[in-house]
From Swiss-Prot:
Descriptive protein name: tRNA dimethylallyltransferase
UniProt xrefs under Pfam families: IPPT (PF01715)
Annotated EC: 2.5.1.75
InterPro entries linked: Dimethylallyltransferase, IPT, P-loop_NTPase
Annotated source species: Burkholderia ambifaria (strain MC40-6)
Function description: Catalyzes the transfer of a dimethylallyl group onto the adenine at position 37 in tRNAs that read codons beginning with uridine, leading to the formation of N6-(dimethylallyl)adenosine (i(6)A).
Keyword Transferase included in the entry's annotation: yes
Length: 324
């Protein structure tokens, strides 16, 4: 599916939206019409054994249409935006070679931005540096490392909470490996490549005209997860000695709140309320990211015919009936 520098870029439809916006329903509706394969743009779906809390597509749904970048790593491991970009570009080519159509679908805007805008030249993770920072944090606490970060990269430190261990560690790691603040490197021009330039990524954004409707859906979905055994799922993960609350996987919305409940730090009602609140905050951030995409095509995800509208829009994108 790659194009030569002189040819017109190949259009790739990207179905984007916040949690509970109906992405799965729209993608499955398209699969009933066309031979598509779905490439997930979701940083939570990459983890194995995290099915209920991530609202992972069911076995039946995945049997109806091939899904990619789901269940690809263990919860103890990490998966970067750079890895996503490389995997997504590879999959787009492989799907096209099979005579099928790739549909990118999800709500992790960091992944989408890396795919469509390129990458910053940040150093890759270094296990030795991370182990040293972990040891420092165990001795002095993350607020002390946050103070250390403020001395070398005040701009990054200012936007991070003193206990945001994952991001503090990464910012210090970048400085130690590169000698430059992360804020400076992130402000530099992004590195693109010819492979991504062969594609025209068209974002179809599922956005709510009434956010209260989406908030109600989020509460209903979280309650359904609890009824489906979400707490038991987290308990099984907790029993693993290699997992802890500061891992990226266990920081996913819902999992952190369930872990706190199982630790006895909160009661069930508080856990539920905090989980719903955290999901709504994630939704708010996702919508903010979407609205920063001037080229997006908006579909009202709370309209009664939202799935039909999304399907019609996706088909027009794939048929190239939209202006370039």
């Amino acid at each position: 599916m790659s194009a030569s520098p002189q040819s017109r870029p190949t259009t790739i439809a990207c179905l984007l939206g916040p949690t509970a916006s109906g992405k799965t329903a729209a993608a499955l509706a398209l699969a009933a019409r066309r031979p598509i394969e779905i490439v997930s743009i979701d940083s939570a779906l990459v983890y194995r054994d995290m099915d209920i809390g991530t609202a992972k597509p069911t076995r039946d749904e995945r049997a109806r249409v091939p899904h990619h970048l789901i269940d690809i790593i263990d919860p103890a491991d990490a998966y970067s935006a750079a890895e996503f970009r490389a995997d997504a570009l590879r999959l787009i080519g492989e799907i096209a070679a099979r005579g099928r159509t790739p549909l990118l679908a999800g709500g992790t805007m960091l992944y989408y931005k890396a795919l469509t805008q390129g990458l910053n030249d940040l150093p890759t993770a270094d296990p030795a540096v991370r182990a040293e920072l972990d040891a420092d944090a165990a001795r002095d606490g993350w607020p002390a490392l946050h103070a250390r970060l403020a001395q070398v990269d005040p701009a990054t430190a200012a936007r991070l909470a003193p206990n945001d261990s994952q991001r503090i560690q990464r910012a210090l790691e970048v400085f130690l490996l590169s000698g430059q603040p992360m804020s400076v490197l992130l402000a530099a021009p992004r590195r693109a490549d010819d492979e991504a330039a062969a594609y025209r990524f068209v974002p179809v954004a599922l956005e709510p005209s009434d956010r209260a409707v989406l908030h109600a859906r989020i509460a209903q979905r979280f309650d359904a997860m609890l009824d489906a055994g979400f707490i038991d799922e987290v308990e099984r993960l907790r029993r693993r000695e290699d997992l802890h609350p500061d891992l990226p996987s266990m920081r996913c919305v819902g999992y952190r709140q369930a872990w706190e409940f199982l630790d006895g730090d909160t009661d069930y009602r508080t856990m539920r309320d905090k989980g719903i609140f955290a999901t709504r905050q994630l939704c708010k951030r996702q919508i903010t990211w979407l609205r920063a995409l001037p080229e997006r095509i908006v579909v009202d995800c709370v309209a009664p015919d939202a799935t039909a509208r999304a399907l019609d829009t996706l088909e027009r994108v794939l048929d190239d009936h939209l202006p370039a």
